[in-house]
Amino acid sequence: MFVDQVKIYVKAGNGGDGMVAFRREKFVPNGGPAGGDGGKGADVVFVVDEGLRTLVDFRFKRIFKAEHGEHGMSKSMHGRGAEDLVVKVPQGTIVKDIDTGEIIADLVAHGQRAVIAKAGRGGRGNKRFATPANPAPELSENGEPGQERNVQLELKVLADVGLVGFPSVGKSTLLSVVSAARPKIAAYHFTTIVPNLGMVDAGDGRSFVMADLPGLIEGASQGVGLGHQFLRHIERTRVIVHVIDMSGSEGRVPYEDYMAINNELEQYNLRLMERPQIIVANKMDMPDAEENLNEFKTKIAEDIPVFPISAVTKTGLRELLLAIADKLETTPEFPLNEILEQEDEDTVLYKYVAEEPDFEISREPDGTFVLSGAKIERLFTMTNFERDASISRFARQLRAMGVDEALRKRGAKDGDIVRLLDYEFEFMD
């Protein structure tokens, strides 16, 4: 089964909690704090495996949760960090964040790795909080929660050349005679419903990968039929080979077919029309094909190459394959996302991340004040509320961030309810 798009949930491991402990040893009356730090949680890491061909494994397992770090221990022993959760994906997999639409990773090379969900760091033990003013602190941190994401995996086949055209124009037949691929061939539309790849030998020592893509119909760019699924696989190709039935045996006009497919490519966007095209006039062994070809050439631009062939009789194939190989040598790869494009492997790409406020305050209809924000929520989840010293530290952190003053400006008074995540507190002025 060929599966090229799935949605999954990933959750990185939480950091281990820090420990509150003291050194208790004979003849050491003032041993001091000895609570260890928690261990780092496990990242969720995707790794490319060239042996995989589809995303079918993700149909049966859609939830991936990494292990948590161990908690800190007494005698200043730190918790062990968890081993990363490694998930294997096929070449050509794009990982997108469903909530933001951001492309997290574009995985194309065997062994390439990408951290999809980052683990939380371990909480600090009380030994970390010792100061001259407080040499024996009774506070520690909880581990930081690991990142969780709903992501979409899209598989876009890796091919140098993509065959496009209406159904039953001979794309599968062409691939079968120029490579060892054996796609399904039959005398009905949409015989090909999944991409087929074949390694093509041009005959002069050069070779390339050709993809036979399922037939397109008008409206494919808007998702008519299986348009989006089919067009997705064209994005990685460097050269588009447009196969046209020049015999008109299906009752269609070759030039209208050519314009209709190009319109779908343009509507789908992603710079597809910037890719060089080679037109293949197929079924030249059929009646009326020569006349239709002459008429077709009068309507298109002179600089667009047209190669008359017959995939059945194998005529004209050598000239076509050499022309494709020549075009590939002068055509660079097209990045799926310009932001991800790099000039070379040594280029360091920095991503700008807008600075978020430490916290935000909103108010619900019942008068409850709601605190939100990544920083304040992280401080809250890492606070050990079983320790009075930790609670006092959290209150000082809120005051230093300006939360108390901001609540007063919003009209908060003694006894008002303040909510943070799923917890509620009373405001005390």
From Swiss-Prot:
Residues 159-329 form the OBG-type G domain. Its EC number is 3.6.5.-. CDD domains: Obg. GO terms for molecular function: GTP binding; GTPase activity; magnesium ion binding. InterPro entries: G_OBG, GTP-bd, GTP-bd_Obg/CgtA, GTP-bd_prot_GTP1/OBG_C_sf, GTP1-OBG_CS, GTP1_OBG_dom, GTP1_OBG_dom_sf, OBG_GTPase. It is found in: Cytoplasm. The gene is obg. Residues 1-158 form the Obg domain. Residues 124-145 are annotated as: Disordered. GTP binds at residues 165-172, 190-194, 212-215, 282-285, 310-312. This is GTPase Obg. It comes from the Bacteria. Its cofactor is Mg(2+). Monomer. SUPFAM superfamilies: Obg GTP-binding protein C-terminal domain, Obg GTP-binding protein N-terminal domain, P-loop containing nucleoside triphosphate hydrolases. The keyword Magnesium applies. Residues 351-429 form the OCT domain. Keywords: Cytoplasm, GTP-binding, Hydrolase, Magnesium, Metal-binding, Nucleotide-binding.
